[in-house]
Amino acid sequence: MLPEAREYLTRAGACFGTPIERLAQMNQPAIGIDCWWQTNVKGLFAVSEAAASHGVYRPGGTALNAGQVGSTRAAQYIAARCRGDASAGFDAAASAALAEMAALADVCRADTGNVRALWQHAAEEMSRCGAAIRDPAQIRAYGKQVEAQLADFAQTVKAGSRTELAMLYHLRDMLLSQRAYLTAMTDYTAHGGKSRGSALHTDLTGGVKPFGQLPDTFTFALDETENPLVQELWYEDGVCRTAWRARAPSPG
């Protein structure tokens, strides 16, 4: 083992026992969940951060399992085991949504589709500006692109097959999600948010570069305060809105 690797494991307290015993200490959930991410309260599912199984400092595989796999398995269980009477107004809301998506399919049908290229572009752009390295200027610029693409979605996105039509719906969901995340990131830095364990936010005015040869994007300042407020975001009338509120006290 390389000395650097041994030093890292030693400082992390990972040089003991068997691999299973060591892994059992990583990201232990604060809430008991089963293999379907259901808590000991029947019908209540806690996934990812809600179960404290997806923290700021985490290995990538754990994050994937906690977030994407956990939510998928919870949805599968709910669809198969938690059937019941629909709440009041569900049929009307579902009918309206189905009609909207059927109309979208009619408008976006074409002999040759472009949804794959648009999907690739959206994925690459989000990875470029909204992953671990976040430049506020790039986030704002791509956020405007996302807004424009959603506004002109029916006119600009085309599907040439059933497979591409499925991708078209996923692309729409992807862009809506990107709009929410980009709005939250922009609002975070606008309220003085700095770099933390999960992301480096470019700060060209009050930040420093750890190494001079790095691009200016790596200029940052650490968030050394504990913000008592929680950022909230919701979708209303086609717009992502944000607000900050005090944290709710812990029960008990």
Which residues are covered by each model-predicted region?
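Long, amphipathic alpha-helical stalk/connector segments used for oligomerization, subunit docking
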Residues: 82-162
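Mobile, glycine/GP-rich and aromatic-enriched active-site lid/loop segments adjacent to catalytic centers
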Residues: 1-59, 132-252
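Aromatic-residue detector
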Residues: 43, 48, 55-56, 70, ...
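A conserved FAD-binding loop/helix module that cradles the flavin
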Residues: 53-78
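Short, surface-exposed, charged/polar-biased interaction segments
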Residues: 65-68, 85, 92, 192
